[in-house]
């Protein structure tokens, strides 16, 4: 399948640079995945499309302040470090700039010296394995010394870093936010529960690979990045009960979708408590085993994410909806508007 099949024209001014003052004031496009019918709503009206007995599945990952600025021991040269993935113990896969200054054995000091790192291995494209030493608890030190890494298409500085977190974020470990969840407020979640809609949580730590462009002509040849996921006993039990009672499972975000589909694919459609790494790549032709609907933002042309939503709603329906979104001046990408596919 050719990558150009997932291209569309997007004016740059439609890429949202800042979040709206109120999370649930975003626009919501509702797309019927069978008929292709489109409706235009406000996000807080999502409630009218959810039924008693349905289940919304949210990703409770929390974005870590993964960008660090340090100095090379001995020379004092400035080094930028971006944490990508925790390995064993205090070792992390990272991206460093300038990479040529960081070789095996290089030591880097951050802030007042409470955090230090030693390079123990080199990878391609500026990747380095760093081993950290610190005083206290690693994530607390990181909160004080690190900065929030925003997607490359967001050029403006974020006034309030919490706006790049969901209101239910709790499991620290992501390099990027699961952005479909940014539209929910505590009040909206309470209203959803009051209607008899279940809310379940999974965890998938989003890696920067989510922004990596597809560089192959035939999408089947794309090498998908792996991300850590986890499902608890409580969530697995709830999802199996919802399925047995005829409720719909609606994923909030492509990250929740990939977690649910990974687990259901391994267990004949059932949900089981487990953790692991997933590199599932969902594109047209994929048969969904877990979800009935999806809440998601508007994605980049030719991205793996637009391929995923095309698998669920049909490529032609998605491209028609995206063209309508451009015409109606919807806001795109991380801080943009949302789509409900049901």
UniProtKB/Swiss-Prot annotation:
Q: Which reaction does it catalyse?
A: 7-aminomethyl-7-carbaguanosine(34) in tRNA + S-adenosyl-L-methionine = epoxyqueuosine(34) in tRNA + adenine + L-methionine + 2 H(+)
Say which domain of life the source belongs to. Bacteria
The record's EC number reads 2.4.99.17
Keywords of the record: Cytoplasm, Queuosine biosynthesis, S-adenosyl-L-methionine, Transferase
Record's GO cellular component terms: cytoplasm
Q: In which pathway does it act?
A: tRNA modification; tRNA-queuosine biosynthesis
Q: Which family does it belong to?
A: Belongs to the QueA family.
Record text on subunit structure and interactions: Monomer.
- The protein depicted here goes by the name S-adenosylmethionine:tRNA ribosyltransferase-isomerase
Gene name of this polypeptide = queA
